[in-house]
Amino acid sequence: MKSSSPKCIPVVSTFASPFDVTPPSSDSTRKPLSLWPGMYHSPVTIALWEARSKIFESLLDPPKDAPPQSELLTRTPSHSRTTIFYPFSTDYILREQYRDPWNEVRIGILLEDLDALAGTISVKVYMLRSDRNFFFIGFVDYLFWCEFSLVTASVDKIVLKKPISVDTDLKIVASVIWVGRSSIEIQLEVIQSELEDVDASPESVALTANFIFVARDSKTGKAAPINRLSPETELEKLLFEEAEARNNLRKKKRGGERKELEHGEYNKLGGLLAEGRIFSDMPALADRNSILLKDTRLENSLICQPQAFELAFSTAYTFAGLVPYFLEVDHVDFLRPVDVGDFLRFKSCVLYTQLDKVDCPLINIEVVAHVTSPEIRSSEVSNTFYFKFTVRPEAKARNNGFKLRNVVPATEEEARHILDRMDA
């Protein structure tokens, strides 16, 4: 797999050797606090920050024939197309930084890289018509400068199509596919193949994700206009139309009221609660192959790091007793921006299981992120994640007779929530 594209950002390991933890020499004044020695970061974050720095430097000295800063420009998707290249096959340290215990790429770090790349592209698209001072704040990409801000509004469903090996070169290809008046949708594809030319092969795409950013005036909070997009190729036009349809659907859902339960759904609600009441009222007679939803909960508190996936993975692991395998994360809406230094509380639980497929039972995990401010006694929900896992086949093969337990609700509120998620 080659990285010859002029818009390809190569990733290098951040340590010189497994025993040398001194970060590579560079101008630390150009990096935010989160990238100083001792702070958490992935190698991609460093590479992307360097790329952002070049964007901002070019804006400080615009060419004489540059259009006025207030003028909206029209760009093509190819103008924003950017590639991140991971030379796993030749960089041992980089491999170890991304390797999980099962010799695959750590999905949690990869999701962070996707978020960082999408944020960089959104800045590039928006800042082409601005030379304002800019500051980048990490996870959940709350990007802002003096007068305007870019916020991650939502992430569409992310599906892992095949395992991602840590021994084979990897790349992420991303570009803007749709622009509204104040919204940007960016599509990212994670590509991995033993072949060098993999761009045209659908089989090489391991994961696809779509990030939606919105531009806001920092003073008024109102929508801020952004550069227009003009798709050229048939594929670009198709992606634009599909994104436009998704945007219209999101608007329709936001404007809709909560539906009342129909008669058939009341029966489902009663069925979900029936077994849970036995656990509450007659625990000695309860089904040993089932468990109450509240008994699957885990919780973690930390200072703003992208750990929702890691907590979901841990929840699935402790629930199943075998190594879980990630399948997908559902659409995510970011209700509140999260800044570096914010105190986050992550709460997770197994919401429900799907046991109809014996060879591939499904574990549905909910992770709720709360932004907590003890000084003002405030706790707000930032966003809610829904992850889907199964059990690794090789782990299940080593445990004959393995069977996942059924998760049942104990309250009507829990039962309604499960039904809402099943219908989502």
Task: State each model region's role.
Residues 30-33, 67-73, 77, 325:
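N-terminal, polar/charged subdomain of small-to-medium soluble alpha/beta proteins
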Residues 105-146, 300-324:
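Active-site helix/loop of acyl-thioester processing domains in fatty-acid/polyketide metabolism
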Residues 75, 79-91, 294-303:
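Short amphipathic
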Residues 131-137, 143-171, 196, 321-342, ...:
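A cross-kingdom feature marking solvent-exposed beta-strand/loop segments within repeated
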Residues 90-101, 304, 319:
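Alpha-helical transmembrane segments and their membrane-interface boundaries
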Residues 246-297:
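Extended repeat-based solenoid scaffolds, especially LRR ectodomains
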Residues 2-62, 165-171, 175-264, 340, ...:
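HotDog/MaoC-like acyl-thioester-processing domains
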